[in-house]
Amino acid sequence: NEADLPFRWGHLLTGPIAIEGAMPGDVLEVRIDAVEPLADWGFNAVEPFDGTLPHDFIMSYRVLSHIGVDRASRTARLPWGTTLPLNPFFGVMGVAPPPEYGEISSREPRKHGGNLDNRRLVAGTTVFFPVWAEGALFTCGDGHGLQGDGEVCVTALEMALEGRFTFVLHKAGSVAERTLPRAESPSHLISMGFDADLDEALRIAVREMISMVCERSTLGRTEA
């Protein structure tokens, strides 16, 4: 029998994973130890009336592209023959949202993380999440074989990935307070901002970067 349930848009995710001792106000450090492809294919989809340019590509059907993946050479071959290097990462990573958010989908990124779609969050990078609920409840998924600076057509190279993570819990007061996810690679600091207004999201990300630079140096906000 078919259940009469409301449709909830969302991603394929693994979790939630409870972190022992995590409480609101703590910071969860997530070390991305490894991200590996699990399949020899992926796909990209262009949806009708969706994405960054919904009125530039007017069609009544979905354009679905099968993309072959060579795991040995870590490359993907597009249908027209272009070969690109893989850069696998999980599009969705986050913890449980603040209770006042209520029930939400995985589509919008907010201060708990979520649908970050940040191609720089690859193996070797560490992400810091503010904890909003007991146990933190880490979740990840939405595997991407590679992606540009965002999903202008709403998808990247969507594919199955396997990840390995190390979790480090920082109790409240032991590190600087966090209100947004931020990340560090071996060579870069990575700030993020989330808002329905892209200009405001940019301002938030710049303020976050200023704070990150100041915390790691003797510079003041103006110099940073």
Features from the language model and the residues they span:
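Extended, compositionally biased non-globular segments
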Residues: 193-222
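Intrinsically disordered, low-complexity linker/loop segments enriched in Gly/Pro
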Residues: 34-123, 128
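Short, conserved secondary-structure segments in the cores of folded domains
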Residues: 8, 15-18, 117
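N-terminal, Lys/Arg-enriched amphipathic/low-complexity engagement segments
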Residues: 1-5
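A generic structural signal for residues embedded in beta-strands
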Residues: 27-30, 129
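Conserved mixed alpha/beta catalytic, RNA-binding, or beta-rich assembly cores of soluble enzyme
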Residues: 86-115, 119-199, 210
